Amino acid sequence: SGEPPIAFVAHMDEVGFVIRKIDDDGFISLNKLGGIPERVLAGQKLLVIGRNGLVSGVFTTWPHHLTPESEKYKVRPISECWLDVGARNSQEVERLGLRVGDFGVYARSWHVEGDTIFANSLDNRAGLASITQMLQRIAGKTNCRLSAIASVQEEFSIRALVPTVRE
C-alpha cells in the first residue's frame, strides 16, 4: 500500500531468580534475573519450578534477634539471603525436585479494591491487553501493515527489540 508498517510492542517477561547453591542445611542461595531491588526481598514468597513441579519458599536472612544491633535495619544483598523451602538438609531439597539452575518467580497474588487492581507484572498484562483492544478497534480502518509484538528479555536489557528491528 506504500504506507509504512506500524508495530505495537509490549513486553511479557517478568523478573525472577535462579538457584545458585543449595547448602547442607537445605537453604537455597539465589541470583536475581532482572532488576529486582534487594530491599524488597526479605519475607517474599517465591515459587521455584523444579523437576517435580512448583515448590513454595520464603526469602529469609538472619533472624532479627540474632542480628547485631548495628546491622538490624540494613538491607541485605541477595548473597546474604536464602530461600527457605522447609527442608532440613540438601537431600530434602533434592527430594522436592530442586537443583542448581532451576528458576523461581514471585508467587502470584492479586486482588481488587474498588476500581483498583493490584497484581504482579500488571504493566506487562495491561500493555498487551491495550494493544489487543486497539488493534480490534482499528481493524480494517487502515491500509498499513499492523503488527503486535509481545517481547521477552525486557527485564534484562534492550535485547528484546533486536529480532523485531531486524524483521
Where are these regions (language model features)?
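N-terminal hydrophobic/helix-forming segments and targeting peptides
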Residues: 1-167
